[in-house]
Design a protein with these regions (language model features):
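C-terminal helical "tail/cap" subdomain of flavin- and related membrane-associated enzymes
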Residues: 350-472
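N-terminal FAD cofactor-binding segment of flavoenzymes
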Residues: 31, 51-99
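Helix-loop-beta segment of a Rossmann-like dinucleotide-binding subdomain
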Residues: 103-122, 159-161, 258-261
C-alpha cells in the first residue's frame, strides 16, 4: 500500500465528523484528515472486509464509472490511488478511443482524448478507498451507527456535533465536532433537522425521470476480440426510451446495464433480459452477451427524479455543517457524473477550509452551487426532452433542443467537436464551451459525412473457419 496521506502540520480544527460511507463521504473524510487532528466517519451499515454490496447502496450493483476529475481528486487525497485501483482490477478506458459509443444516431469517432472512464464495481471502488482511509492514523470509523440529529450551540447558529445510536434503537450517544459533513445521500434528513432548529426549509428542485435500470454480471466470453473496451448505445431523444451500457469490471467480468424510461422497463426473466438486447438500435451488445455465462441475478434500481437542494440560496444556515454528494444534489445516474461531482465537492470543501472555519458554511455552499450548474444543466436538459417529464422548461428550451440535436450529429463526425463535448461531459470544461462562436458555426453549417454514416465497430468475435470459407 502506498504511503498514507501526510497529516496536517497546522490543523484547521481538532475534530470533524462525516456521516455516510458513500464514495463522497469516504473522499470527504480523506480530505478532512489533512485539516483536522481527528476525523470520525459514521456509517449506518456494518462495513465488512472486502468488496461487498452494502444494504445502504441500492444502486451498488449497477455500472459505476469514475471520471478523470474524480480520479484526480482521489490521487491528490490518497497518493498512488490510481495504481492501487488498477492493481485491484479496475479498467482504465479512454473515453473516446476505447469506448464504442452510439448516441444521437451516430457512432462517435474513435480517437484518444486522454480522459478516462474508470470501470469497476462500486463495492471494489469503495473497498480500495476505505482501505486507504482506514490506514490514516487520525481517522476513526464508527460503523453500525446512525446519526439521529445535530448538536448545536445555545443560539442554534452552529452545529457542534451529532447524536448517534445503533440502528433500530439502543443507547444514544453524542459526538462533538467543529465540522459535521452530511454524506448520507439523497434521503438526507438535514432539511428536516434544520427546519426543526428554526432555519428556513431548503428550496428543492425535482425533475421526474422515472427510469428503471436492470443490470447483470456476465463472464467475459471466450474469443471476444472486440476493438473496444466499453460500449454504450444511447437513445435519440425524445423518441427513443431505451439504452444499454456494457462495461468490463474486475475478475474478467462484464457488467451489462439496460435502462428504460417512462414505463419501458427491461425484462427481468433470463430469456427476456438477454432477448431485449435484440431490440436495441444497434446489434453489437446482443452479439456479445447472447451466449455469455451469467454470474448472478438481475439487479433492478428504480430512479424517480433528479433532486437538487439549493443550500446555496439559504439566507440563514448554521456554521459547522456541510452537505456533500447526493445529500446536496442527486443526478440521473445515466449521465455518470454523480461520484465525480461528489469528489469535486469534497475538493471544494478542502479549498474553503484553507481560509479557516470562520464563514466556511457560506463559502462552501456558494462554491458548490456554482460547481453544480454545469452537470445539473447537462443532466436535466436531456431528461426534460421527454414530454412525459414534469418540470419547468427554461426559456428557449425548444431552440436549445434543436441545437442539441444538431450538436449530437456534429460530434458524430467532427473530432474537435467531440473532444470539446467530452471535456464538458467530464466536467473539465463548462457547458459554455459548447456555445463558443466556432462551435455554433459548426453546429449550424456542418453536415455528417458518408464515412460517419457508415462507421461502426468491428465484429466482436473473430470469424470461424466455416464463416471464412463461406465468405470466400
Amino acid at each position: 500500500m502506498s504511503t498514507s496521506t501526510p497529516l496536517p502540520s497546522t490543523p484547521t480544527g481538532k475534530h470533524a465528523i462525516v456521516y455516510g460511507g458513500s464514495t463522497a463521504g469516504l473522499i470527504a473524510a480523506g480530505v478532512l484528515s489533512r485539516h483536522f487532528e481527528r476525523v470520525t466517519l459514521v456509517e449506518r451499515d456494518r462495513l465488512e472486509n472486502g468488496s461487498q454490496l452494502r444494504k445502504g447502496v441500492p444502486q451498488g450493483a449497477h455500472v459505476h464509472g469514475l471520471l478523470t476529475p474524480g480520479m484526480n481528486v482521489l490521487c491528490e487525497v490518497f497518493p498512488g490511488f490510481r495504481e492501487e485501483l488498477k492493481a485491484a482490477g479496475s479498467h482504465f478506458i479512454d473515453f473516446t478511443g476505447e469506448h464504442a459509443w452510439f448516441m444521437g444516431g451516430f457512432w462517435r469517432p474513435r480517437i484518444p482524448c486522454g480522459l478516462h472512464f474508470y470501470a469497476q464495481s462500486r463495492p471494489l471502488l469503495e473497498w480500495v478507498i476505505r482501505q486507504r482511509l482506514q490506514a490514516l492514523p487520525n481517522v476513526h470509523v464508527r460503523d453500525g451507527r446512525e446519526v439521529t440529529g445535530f448538536l448545536t450551540s445555545p443560539d442554534k447558529a452552529r452545529v457542534t456535533g451529532v447524536h448517534l445510536r445503533v440502528p433500530g434503537g439502543g443507547q444514544e450517544e453524542t459526538l462533538e465536532a467543529e465540522l459535521v459533513v452530511d454524506a448520507s445521500g439523497r434521503g438526507s434528513r438535514t432539511p428536516q433537522w434544520l427546519e426543526a432548529l428554526g432555519f428556513p426549509r431548503v428550496e428543492e428542485t425535482h425533475i421526474q425521470v422515472d427510469v428503471v435500470y436492470a443490470s447483470r454480471l456476465f463472464r467475459r466470453p471466450p474469443g471476444l476480440v472486440a476493438d473496444w473496451k466499453m460500449m454504450s448505445i444511447g437513445p435519440k431523444l425524445p423518441t427513443e426510451r431505451r439504452m444499454a451500457v456494457l462495461a468490463p469490471i474486475e475478475n474478467d467480468q462484464m457488467l451489462l446495464l439496460l435502462a428504460g424510461w417512462h414505463g419501458l422497463q427491461p425484462p427481468l426473466d433470463d430469456a427476456g433480459y438477454v432477448g431485449s438486447t435484440r431490440e436495441l438500435i444497434q446489434p453489437h451488445i446482443h452479439e456479445v452477451i447472447q451466449n455469455a455465462e451469467p454470474l448472478g441475478p438481475i439487479n433492478v434500481f428504480r430512479y424517480s427524479h433528479n433532486q437538487r437542494r439549493h443550500y446555496e440560496r439559504m439566507s440563514r444556515f448554521p456554521e459547522g455543517l456541510a452537505p456533500v454528494g447526493d445529500a446536496f444534489c442527486s443526478f440521473n445516474p445515466i449521465y455518470g457524473q454523480g461520484m465525480t461531482t461528489g469528489a469535486l465537492q469534497a475538493q471544494a470543501l478542502s479549498e474553503c477550509l484553507r481560509q479557516g472555519l470562520g464563514g466556511l458554511a457560506s463559502r462552501y455552499r456558494r462554491q458548490v452551487g456554482q460547481l453544480l450548474e454545469s452537470p445539473w444543466t447537462m443532466a436535466t436538459s436531456g431528461d426534460l426532452r421527454f414530454p412525459q417529464v414534469e418540470g419547468k422548461r427554461p426559456p428557449a428550451f425548444a431552440l436549445m433542443s434543436w441545437y442539441s440535436d444538431r450538436l449530437q450529429a456534429l460530434v458524430g463526425h467532427d473530432e474537435e467537436a467531440l473532444n470539446t463535448f467530452v471535456r464538458v461531459m467530464q466536467m473539465v470544461e463548462p457547458t459554455t464551451a459548447l456555445f463558443s462562436p466556432g462551435m455554433v458555426l459548426k453546429v449550424l453549417t456542418s453536415r455528417p459525412t458518408a464515412a460517419a454514416m457508415e462507421r461502426r465497430p468491428e465484429p466482436p468475435f473473430a470469424p470461424t473457419a466455416a464463416a471464412k470459407n463461406q465468405a470466400a
